[in-house]
Regions:
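PLP-dependent amino-acid enzyme catalytic core
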Residues: 1-137
Length: 137
């Protein structure tokens, strides 16, 4: 699985980006792109904001999680997924794991926001609290 994960982590490739977009669009709605005139005035060019906070888990991280799960085989996902995070990555992996019916375990540090932990659990993932910071988790 590591080799396949490394392939998903390659340098940005426009063709693969478009392929990922097609995959992601099967699972979540496109987020709005809004022109902000005041921001445009302040920075001296046209400014558009992509509202990734409107995604199911509140961030763009769900895109990577969905693309990851989509490209893994049933055998590769058989034992479930284990991730370490303080927030958005864990939320996204837990949500996508629930969608793909793959068990997900999320390791978080001791000082993690309890509300984030609760939401991760609400997506069906197991939360393990370990360590003083993200790196320990």
């Amino acid at each position: 699985m590591l080799k396949k994960y490394e392939a998903l982590s390659e340098q940005v490739n426009p063709t693969k980006t478009l392929m990922a977009q097609a995959v992601i669009n099967r699972y979540i709605k496109k987020t709005s792109l809004t022109h902000y005139s005041e921001l445009s005035r302040l920075i001296g060019c046209e400014a558009f904001v992509k509202h990734e906070n409107h995604n199911p888990t509140g961030s763009f991280k769900i895109r990577g999680a969905l693309n990851f799960f989509h490209h893994m085989s049933t055998e590769e996902l058989e034992g479930g997924i284990l991730v370490a995070t303080k927030g958005n990555h864990g939320l996204a992996m837990a949500w996508a794991g629930q969608w793909f019916q793959v068990p997900c375990t999320v390791v978080v540090p001791q000082d993690n926001n309890p509300e984030i932990n609760r939401i991760i659990e609400s997506y069906g993932a197991e939360v393990i609290v370990h360590g003083e910071d993200f790196y320990d988790a």
